[in-house]
């Protein structure tokens, strides 16, 4: 019966949505249709079609009142059950607080005591929470570069080798990067699940603070580069791990560290193939690739792309003027 009754709902809803004047306008359209397309008003006496309309609307009105009454009853019953359950829980917890002590307190006072006890227990858990990294994190900590094959790489000795994500794996957290953003992962080795309100996380344009309330922050310092705070986000994953995404403002530089107090990684050892360089548009990608090439050439003491361009022009000029002697010329 319900399915049969609502079979025209979609059609009528579509028509009703086009009536910005609401129900009066919608009813006016229905009456207009009956006037123009049927003999509803002229095929019978006015008293007859008025009675028909009243019968239909009275029937639907009674159904609406009955349905609304049933909904109110169901809601009140649900609220009573909920209230009874809460009273039972409060009573049980009051008894648990002090089995040997009779307390003459109100429900509100009992609720306040329970909340205070829960807050204390939660804070005790947080205060006793260890900051030890997981074993897997310790095993994968980034190692310093102790040996180089090229003389030009001597300046990289002592710096940390980038991890597979072009970032760094430290004792308490891991970060990776592309030219566009930094991904930070902070696992908490706890025996209980964290909640978002247990955390203190602040992302500034040039600063980052991450930690558990009541404890020394795990990270609290100046970022290596500036970030867009409105595009940077964090999420608590599986109640154990904080994941933070920082959106770089300068998308043409690799970060050598997350915060200035961190050990430095060797940006010369970064593998751009593992970054999202392919996601950049053609013009930006060409510019970044040229910049990275010139940076490597300068570090190796070799000519940059601009230097090569000048050398090519000079060679062509020499070929066009063989009569000229360039052997005693010095070029910068």
Swiss-Prot record:
Supply the Gene3D superfamilies for this chain. Answer: 2.60.40.790
Listed GO biological process terms = mRNA transport; nuclear migration; nucleus localization; positive regulation of dendrite morphogenesis; protein folding
Q: By its UniProt entry, which CDD domains does this protein fall under?
A: p23_mNUDC_like
Q: Does the keyword Chaperone apply?
A: yes
Disulfide pairs here are none
Q: What does this protein do?
A: Chaperone protein with functions in nuclear localization and cytoplasmic mRNA trafficking. In postmitotic neurons, acts with nudE downstream of dar1 to ensure correct positioning of the nuclei in primary dendrites and as a consequence, is required for determining multipolar neuron morphology. Stabilizes PCID2 in the cytoplasm and thereby is required for promoting cytoplasmic mRNA trafficking.
Q: What is this protein called?
A: Nuclear migration protein nudC
Q: What gene is this protein a product of?
A: nudC
């Amino acid at each position: 019966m319900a399915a049969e009754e609502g079979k025209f709902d979609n059609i009528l809803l579509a028509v009703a949505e086009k009536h910005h004047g609401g129900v009066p306008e919608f009813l006016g359209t229905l009456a207009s249709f009956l006037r123009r397309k049927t003999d509803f008003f002229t095929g019978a006496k006015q008293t007859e079609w008025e009675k028909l309309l009243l019968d239909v609307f009275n029937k639907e009105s009674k159904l609406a009142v009955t349905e609304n009454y049933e909904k109110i009853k169901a809601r009140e019953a649900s609220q009573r059950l909920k209230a009874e359950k809460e009273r039972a829980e409060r009573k049980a917890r009051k008894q648990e607080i002090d089995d040997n002590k009779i307390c003459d307190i109100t429900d509100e006072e009992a609720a306040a005591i329970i909340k205070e006890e829960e807050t204390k227990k939660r804070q005790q858990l947080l205060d006793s929470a260890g900051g030890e990294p997981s074993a897997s994190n310790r095993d994968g900590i980034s190692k310093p570069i102790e040996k180089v094959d090229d003389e030009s790489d001597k300046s990289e000795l002592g710096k940390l080798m980038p991890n597979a994500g072009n970032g760094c794996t430290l004792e308490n957290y891991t970060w990776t990067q592309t030219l566009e953003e930094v991904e930070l992962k902070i696992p908490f080795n706890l025996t209980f699940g964290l909640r978002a309100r247990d955390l203190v996380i602040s992302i500034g344009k040039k600063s980052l603070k991450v930690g558990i309330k009541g404890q020394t922050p795990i990270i609290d310092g100046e970022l290596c580069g500036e970030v867009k705070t409105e595009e940077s986000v964090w999420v608590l994953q599986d109640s154990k791990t904080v994941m933070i995404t920082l959106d770089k403002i300068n998308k043409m530089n690799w970060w050598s560290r997350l915060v200035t107090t961190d050990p430095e990684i060797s940006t010369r050892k970064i593998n751009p193939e593992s970054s999202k360089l392919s996601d950049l548009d053609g013009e930006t990608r060409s510019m970044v690739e040229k910049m990275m090439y010139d940076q490597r050439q300068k570090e190796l003491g070799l000519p940059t792309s601009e230097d090569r361009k000048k050398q090519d022009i000079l060679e062509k000029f020499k070929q066009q003027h063989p009569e000229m002697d360039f052997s005693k010329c010095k070029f910068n």
